[in-house]
């Protein structure tokens, strides 16, 4: 009998029975007839598109629903021996920890040590017990070196770990996580998943993790629960989930599973290791490395074309609190018309600073920057929406032209708050574009900073279409004086390698303020560990990064 | 950008001291500023506050507070000079002004304003040093048993203010990035948006507090007595400064008069008190360890940078010094 089966015999860490819930004044129920059990020590992945009910289910399991949000609830939720509907989140805190998407709003103290200690202090624990618990959880999460730091000096990944430590310090038997890696770079995201697996294996903490990037965590999960329209649509093993998603909801397929299904290989793999093992089986021939195609350099070779951005040795220094720090260190970069460029690199590498400098928000302290009109969408599209009617945000012909470009001309009278997340983002793009266009032609450079945070696959696909459409529109070139038109270049700063592989022809990889790699997307995204797609990690073939390319490469050898 | 007054953990004595000791020490300097009007003593208190900040590593906080304090001092001098016409040394007669009536600028009013301005500047620098060097979490933990809800409100404010400042900066950037064809963003819509965002964040933070167990009716947690080996030093310096200030006041060390003529006393009591107050700024000085105790209990001298340099210099000159 497996250990998991033994654990399954014990009282479940979480038991949900016939749960239905509606937020106050909501037209539709957020959850309908949800029944679910999480065994002690089990790692369960919660999959589903945006607004499918994942977050609400997690909030019900930690008591925020209905105690904090109100609304109408029916059914039963038990966390260990506690009734989560009758008991408030405070009482449940000892039995369940909760980690949300945005680490910024999950810390309330000034220093890390005080933040982690707060739940114990509020519970009335003795000072000695608190000191030990803080030390233990800091060691478990590898953050003892952060204890004396102030929370405003931490990176997103560090802050997320601190929030996790505060959620775990009471030693709950269940931890709920709502897209905890959505704001992290691939390195920090993978580290967090690895950490969860270790907590799960070594300390027996049951994990219920809601996540969009399934390829990141499917291999770590014991079980997958998929949700759709507030109901559970699938509950089973990861391999069975992939077979189910193939027919029921292809947007939930992982890239490796899609590669296998396109190539007609069974069974579908739950992770890179699994996929490689399957490919080593007799009867399946893995293409040799040299069989890969030559990758064409996407940069324009026409010397007559005027670049839309030309940076030569630019340095940018920013005030980071105590001292000025060089964030960009002599960047050389040229982007031509019509290019689709992914700007990648870990948090703090200088991606956003480069885009903000191009848009005129920062002034280089050295070097030469030549750039025409730039429309930049920052990381929070909501910041652009300040009025209650789309038409009031974008008045006149210029506004209408911008709305047409993003396909929102029908929504003139809508309230931006009533639009979907994707539509709000497109509206923000239109606001950045308005007045920078020549008729229906876009400005020279359209820049998007981390546009896929918290997005599901379907919305990312929509964004890929939008980028392709933007890159196909005419634009004013850098020396606007010539008034000649070219295609617009689109530059997207992103951590999402799969998204980069889907839209970009070229990838520029930044590391600590310098360009460390610049080349065709297929080449850059197949030549590393972290900044490589799942298909690239499975096949390890230069130039093969998407499931379609992978299936073609496998097909050549079969 | 991080506020210059934000707390920054550093390994200095002032940061290591318990909040009570740090407050007593900086409070004593501020108390001198409010007890005395003599510019000599006020300058000494200012020197003490600046020294304390610099030795504690809060250079940026001191610099910014000094700039703000001196600007405020200048404002007080100007306002006092315009509003108060007392004093015998008239420097300028500016005639009749609406609301103010006859305005005569006198040397005495300027000096009186300078005294008030210096007092404000000292208080500002001391407050900046407190803010940059004293861990607010430890202060709030100290206050929590006395006023739990107020302490928590203060915690939230101290957390939400920098978050709101970051939100405001982001919204300003977004308004600058709007295309010229989009409706311009006035201050009112921006403020509304900032308020709405802050409320959303406040709701999220409130949810976090709920999850941390804020609503629990737990018995008040006992706190460790936050002790430091520097506490006695700061309490002692605070005590000495306060006792000397009170005694000096009784002995006429605050010998300063502005009207009808300026008279600044420079008697021994004033000078001694000023020297003592200025020297109190050295309290956060970290003493270098000069001896190391080995495992067997023997004590050996530690090489320090100064003596090494001396030895190096002595060696170059061909003189052996130990």
Explain the meaning of each model-derived region.
Chain A
Residues 128-146, 309, 314, 395, ...:
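Conserved ABC ATPase "signature" region
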């Amino acid at each position: 009998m497996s250990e998991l089966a033994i654990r399954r015999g014990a009282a479940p860490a979480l038991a949900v029975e016939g749960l239905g819930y509606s937020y106050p004044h909501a037209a539709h129920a957020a959850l309908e007839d949800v029944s679910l059990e999480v065994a002690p020590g089990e790692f369960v992945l919660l999959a589903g598109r945006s607004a499918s009910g994942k977050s609400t289910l997690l909030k019900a399991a930690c008591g925020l629903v209905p105690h904090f949000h109100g609304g109408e609830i029916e059914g039963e939720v038990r966390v260990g021996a506690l009734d989560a509907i009758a008991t408030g989140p405070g009482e449940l805190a000892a039995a369940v920890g909760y980690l949300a998407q945005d680490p910024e709003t999950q810390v309330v103290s000034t220093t890390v040590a005080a933040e982690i200690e707060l739940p114990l202090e509020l519970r009335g624990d003795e000072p000695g017990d608190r000191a030990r618990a803080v030390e233990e959880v800091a060691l478990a999460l590898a953050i003892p070196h952060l204890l004396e730091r102030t929370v405003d000096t931490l990176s997103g990944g560090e802050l997320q770990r601190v929030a996790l430590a505060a959620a775990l310090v009471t030693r709950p038997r269940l931890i709920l996580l709502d897209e905890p890696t959505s704001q992290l770079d691939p390195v920090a995201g993978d580290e967090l998943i690895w950490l969860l697996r270790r907590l799960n294996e070594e300390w027996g903490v049951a994990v219920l993790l809601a996540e969009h990037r399934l390829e990141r965590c499917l291999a770590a999960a014991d079980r997958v629960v998929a949700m759709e329209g507030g109901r559970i649509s699938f509950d089973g093993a990861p391999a069975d989930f992939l077979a189910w998603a193939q027919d029921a909801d292809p947007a939930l397929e992982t890239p490796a599973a899609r590669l296998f299904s396109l190539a007609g290989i069974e069974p579908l793999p739950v992770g890179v290791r699994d996929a490689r093992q399957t490919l080593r089986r007799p009867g399946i021939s893995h293409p040799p490395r040299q069989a890969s195609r030559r990758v064409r350099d996407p940069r324009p070779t026409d010397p007559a074309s005027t670049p839309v951005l030309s940076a030569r040795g630019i340095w940018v220094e920013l005030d980071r609190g105590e001292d000025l720090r060089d964030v960009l260190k002599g960047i050389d970069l040229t982007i031509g018309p019509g290019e689709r460029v992914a700007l990648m690199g870990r948090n703090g590498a200088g991606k956003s600073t480069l885009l903000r400098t191009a848009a005129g928000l920062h002034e280089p302290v050295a070097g030469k920057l030549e750039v025409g009109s730039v429309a930049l969408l920052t990381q929070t599209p909501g910041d652009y929406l300040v009025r209650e009617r789309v038409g009031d945000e974008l008045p006149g012909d210029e506004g209408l032209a911008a709305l047409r470009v993003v396909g929102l001309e029908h929504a003139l009278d809508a309230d931006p708050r009533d639009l979907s997340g994707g539509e709000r983002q497109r509206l923000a793009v239109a606001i950045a574009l308005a007045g920078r266009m020549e008729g229906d032609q876009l400005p020279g450079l359209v820049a998007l900073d981390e546009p896929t945070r918290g997005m599901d696959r379907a919305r990312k696909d929509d964004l890929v279409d939008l980028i392709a459409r933007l890159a196909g529109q005419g634009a004013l070139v850098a020396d606007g004086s010539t008034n000649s038109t070219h295609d617009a270049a689109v530059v997207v700063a992103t951590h999402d390698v799969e998204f980069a592989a889907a839209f970009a022809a070229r990838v520029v990889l930044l590391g600590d303020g310098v360009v460390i790699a610049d080349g065709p997307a297929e080449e850059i995204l197949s030549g590393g560990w972290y900044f490589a797609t799942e298909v690239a990690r499975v096949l390890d073939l230069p130039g093969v990064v998407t499931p379609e390319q992978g299936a073609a490469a496998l097909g050549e050898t079969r | 950008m991080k506020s210059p007054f934000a707390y920054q953990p550093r390994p200095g004595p002032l940061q290591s001291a318990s909040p009570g000791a740090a407050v007593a020490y900086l409070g004593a300097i501020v108390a001198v500023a409010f007890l005395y009007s003599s510019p000599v003593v006020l300058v000494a208190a200012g020197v003490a506050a600046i020294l304390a900040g610099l030795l504690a590593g809060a250079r940026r906080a001191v610099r910014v507070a000094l700039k703000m304090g001196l600007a405020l001092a200048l404002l007080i001098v100007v306002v006092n000079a315009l509003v108060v016409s007392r004093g015998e040394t008239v420097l300028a007669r500016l005639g009749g002004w609406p609301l103010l009536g006859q305005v005569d600028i006198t040397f005495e009013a300027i000096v009186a304003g300078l005294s008030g301005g210096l007092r404000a500047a000292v208080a500002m620098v001391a407050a900046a040093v407190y803010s940059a060097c004293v861990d607010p979490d430890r202060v709030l933990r100290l206050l929590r048993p006395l006023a739990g809800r107020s302490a928590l409100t203060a915690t939230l404010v101290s957390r939400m203010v920098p978050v709101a400042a970051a939100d405001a900066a982001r919204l300003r950037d977004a308004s600058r990035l709007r295309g010229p064809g989009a409706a311009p963003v006035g201050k009112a819509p921006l403020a509304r948006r900032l308020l709405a965002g802050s409320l959303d964040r406040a709701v999220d933070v409130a949810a976090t507090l709920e999850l941390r167990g804020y609503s629990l009716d737990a018995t008040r947690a006992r706190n460790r007595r936050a002790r430091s080996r520097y506490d006695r030093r700061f309490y002692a310096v605070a005590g000495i400064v306060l006792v000397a200030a009170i005694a000096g006041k009784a002995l006429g060390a605050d010998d300063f008069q502005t009207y009808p003529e300026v008279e600044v006393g420079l008697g021994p009591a004033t000078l001694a008190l000023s020297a003592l107050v200025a020297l109190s700024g050295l309290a956060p000085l970290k003493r270098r360890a000069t001896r190391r105790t080995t495992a067997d209990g023997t004590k050996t001298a530690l090489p320090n940078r100064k003596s090494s340099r001396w030895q190096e210099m002595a060696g170059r000159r061909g003189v052996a010094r130990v």
